[in-house]
Amino acid sequence: HKTIDNVIKRTFKHYYDHTDADIIFDRGPWGIPANLELLKKYYDPDPKFLILNRPLVEVLASFLKVKKSGTDKDLTDSLMDPNTGKLKQDMVSSRNIVKSNLPHLKIEYNDLVSDIKKTIEDIYKFFNIPFFKHRYTDLEQLSYNNVKYDDSVMECNLHTIRTDKVKKEELNLEDYFSKDTIDKMKGYDIYV
């Protein structure tokens, strides 16, 4: 038992040792009860969370837009699988954070893409981070420790960004779903 505790503590402490950064936002379903328990026990008893909120129907459509192969049903079933689905885990995590009244900032996707400067400033304020002047045009593809993402091994091209500027790309939802399905998903609130 103590051995496992030591391993977990050191994992949290040293996971980002090789990363040259003062501040790191770790993306993951940390609000899932088991993950939250580990986070509070081994890293920070009072964690703060950032939640990016976007309508479910838009999230699913954006995945379908960039999928490389397979059926739409296979991809949505995979994303929404109650036990292993990435999107389902993120939804459960976000819901648990909000319902648990843990300190969190929920930002809307539309606010992020329509007024990124203000949204970033709101994030800095919430996390008490000193302001940093960002560039929102002429962007570069993400690399991490001089390694760029290779989405050729993924089901979807998830990491390539538009480099000219941050903007919302409009999706015609009816290209991906029936009107009935769109109406059902538009009324779905993950926080209820």
PLM regions: where:
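PAPS-dependent sulfation machinery
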Residues: 1-35, 42, 158, 162-167, ...
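Alpha-helical packing segments of well-folded alpha/beta enzyme cores
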Residues: 7, 11, 35, 90-95, ...
